[in-house]
Amino acid sequence: MAKVILFHGTPDKNVVPTYGKGEDKHDYGRGFYLTESLELAKEWAVCRPNKENGWVHKYELEIDSLKILDFQNENILSWLAELMKHRDASDSKRYRMLAGKFIAKYGIDTSEYDVIKGWRANASYFYIAREFVRDNVDIDILEDLLSLGGLGIQYCIKSELAYSKLKEIKDALYMVSYDEFNEKYNLRDAEARRKMRD
């Protein structure tokens, strides 16, 4: 039985992953987001500016029977198209039209997948997405630009089956210091933005 250990960083001490919950405008749409990196989960737990400590919940995901889409194994343009489905890089009519064509050409139908795995995005990625669909960024350098961020890999639990295979390891709940890890989160984010601009 193949399993993967994942972490969920959150301001909430009590978390119940529930099918159908979550924000539509996250990178891969509605779902429950986790990472294999404990350090990233700690940063994500305190990424809000409210100066409160956060929590990292540890989970075990049984993956044998799950259909997983890993964007690291796909064309980078397919990943970018997936982000465009859920997050608006611009509210201009021209961008929306171009983004629609881009999604139609490069997008992957993710509806049959139980889990989506891939890079995490921040605002810098959407700047690049906007410039790319406007033909201001060459495809030859797109992958290099997108790999500069270093914002980590995330898993998004999508299906009822995947939720049923996710089990929290309750005695591994970890409190995260806001003062220590919020600064790390902000530094990582600022460095990703700087690399995108340079």
Map each language-model feature to its residues:
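ADP-ribose/NAD+-binding catalytic cleft of ART/PARP-like enzymes
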Residues: 1-28, 46, 57, 192, ...
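Catalytic centers of nucleases
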Residues: 31
